[in-house]
Regions:
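Catalytic Walker B motif of ABC-type/P-loop ATPase nucleotide-binding domains
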Residues: 159-162
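Conserved ABC ATPase signature
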Residues: 134-138, 142
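Helix-to-loop junction immediately C-terminal to a conserved catalytic motif
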Residues: 48
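Helix N-cap at the start of a conserved alpha-helix in ABC-type nucleotide-binding domains
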Residues: 170-172
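Conserved ABC ATPase "signature" region
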Residues: 63-64, 111-129
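A short, proline-enriched helix->beta-strand linker immediately N-terminal to the Walker B motif
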Residues: 153-157
Length: 252
């Protein structure tokens, strides 16, 4: 379980996170939503210890990640897989080597075991035959899948998805949403989706956390989201629908 307790963070005296608290239960998929500049990415970086709060705590399985040694922080980080926005594949490595990278960096596995694990991960993301391809030979959706294979290579307990559908056409975005749902259930991981894509939220999330002007404005289930009359939350949802120009369900 992850607990965020009264988190504060400012940059150049500009508050970005203000008294943010959040509890993420094991096995759930939670979507962190909000406008650009609302603090979503900054909160995500705090979850894996890339940023330290000015005040407050982040606890992973009861451990304050900002009060441990660097070696212990590395151990905690190994429990997280991250699907970075855009995929962030290494251009100089083929798909196989991209997925193998964390295995070579953080484990002492033999080459045979690395080969087996990479192939297993590529099959899980439904790309069993792309190992030899370079990133520039892959479509946007395929890059996301390879990046997701890399994110699950170390068998994490938590996966952070940073804007997983940004830049994808609706059909490909739907496929990525379905893959995320499938992997979260098959691998029994906790999913944390940082997004402004309400289509993805409705497709994959169990709960939603809405950041507004650096504060945690609203937290609830999808059912509670549908029933909410919170004016700020509703304005965000309606703006998302308007910007996309179609009903919030991509399959509608």
């Amino acid at each position: 379980m992850i607990r965020v307790e009264h988190l504060y963070k400012s940059f150049d005296d500009r508050p970005v996170l203000v008294d943010v608290s959040l509890e993420i239960q094991d096995g759930e998929t939670i979507a962190i939503i909000g406008r650009s500049g609302s603090g979503k990415s900054v909160l995500m970086k705090h979850l894996i210890g890339l940023l330290k709060p000015d005040r407050g705590r982040v606890l992973v399985d009861g451990v304050d990640i900002n009060a441990v040694s660097y070696s212990e922080l590395r151990r905690i980080r190994r429990q997280f897989g991250v699907l970075f926005q855009g995929g962030a594949l290494f251009d100089s490595m083929n798909a196989f080597e991209n997925v193998a990278f964390p295995l070579r960096t953080f484990t002492n596995l033999s080459e045979e075991d690395i080969r087996r694990r990479v192939q297993e991960c590529l099959e899980l993301v439904q790309l069993p035959d792309v190992g030899a391809k370079m990133p520039d030979e892959l479509s946007g959706g395929m890059k996301k899948r390879v990046a997701l294979a890399r994110a699950i290579a170390l068998k994490p307990r938590y996966i952070i998805y940073d804007e997983p559908t940004t830049g994808l056409d609706p059909e490909t975005a739907n496929a990525i949403d379905e893959l995320i749902c499938d992997l979260n259930h098959r691998l029994n991981v906790t999913g944390i989706v940082v997004t402004h894509d309400m289509h993805s939220v409705l497709s994959i999330a169990d709960r939603v956390a809405f950041l507004y002007q650096g504060r945690m404005h609203w937290i609830g289930t999808l059912d509670e989201l549908h029933r909410s009359d919170d004016p700020i939350l509703l304005a965000f949802v309606k703006a998302s629908e308007y910007q996309i120009g179609q009903p919030l369900s991509r399959t509608a």
